[in-house]
Design a protein with these regions (language model features):
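Cysteine-centric redox/oxidoreductase cores and disulfide-bonded domains
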Residues: 1-7, 78-109
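Extracytoplasmic thiol/disulfide redox context detector
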Residues: 1-85
């Protein structure tokens, strides 16, 4: 019974992912790094104040250096308080000025 319930949960998750694939992977408003036509797309959910996100940042940078076929879609989720919201707003302003990547990299160092 547990196994069939787990299989149904996995199937439901796959259906939900398929239903939202465009919003996750192909939203033209989302900033991204890497190859715009990459054959592999990674979606990174982050908060610039998150220590785990900061620790993971060099790994993503290294992946992009090594594999020119990767596109990383960036989803800023400001969940760690008012300073996270302020940083998210700054990133939006930077995106409008074509400076998102530079600010993103600076905030996650």
């Amino acid at each position: 019974l547990e196994e069939s319930e787990a299989a149904e949960r996995v199937a439901a998750q796959r259906r939900a992912l398929a239903a939202e694939a465009d919003a996750l992977f192909r939203d033209p408003a989302d900033p991204f790094k890497g190859n715009p036509r990459g054959d592999v797309t990674l979606v990174e959910f982050f908060d610039v104040r998150c220590g785990y996100c900061r620790a993971f940042h060099p790994t993503v940078a290294e992946l992009l250096r090594r594999d020119r076929g990767v596109r990383v879609v960036l989803k800023d989720i400001p969940i760690l308080g008012p300073n996270s919201v302020l940083a998210a707003r700054a990133l939006l302003a930077a995106q409008r000025q074509n400076r998102y990547e530079a600010l993103y990299d600076a905030l996650l160092r």
